[in-house]
């Protein structure tokens, strides 16, 4: 399978699994059309009538996620991260793990972990790079579905 198609299918897999989990929890989940920027799922809690936008990032056998922000864009991070994220990890045996993080939690995590990465001693200074979050940094958010509504 071509790499681009495989990556697209892995992304769709994560979105469908997240929508399914939301449905099991009694929430309404609707996948967006792919031309809707920075939102993969619209969510509704029928009990509270609260609505949310959700961004889903999925990897298979890769233990880090790019979050759509370059290092040079850090000053605009509050504008670029607009909603909660669900990070979906699919292992080599197709087991699924979910890491759910609110918008504010994600912004704090990005700033902390990126500072740690950026300030490491290096021979050459870093050029601009896409900011990524590692699976180990997301551990405390595993299966924390209520973070969607924070």
What residue spans do the PLM features occupy?
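Mixed-charge (Asp/Glu-Lys/Arg
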Residues: 1-37, 42-150
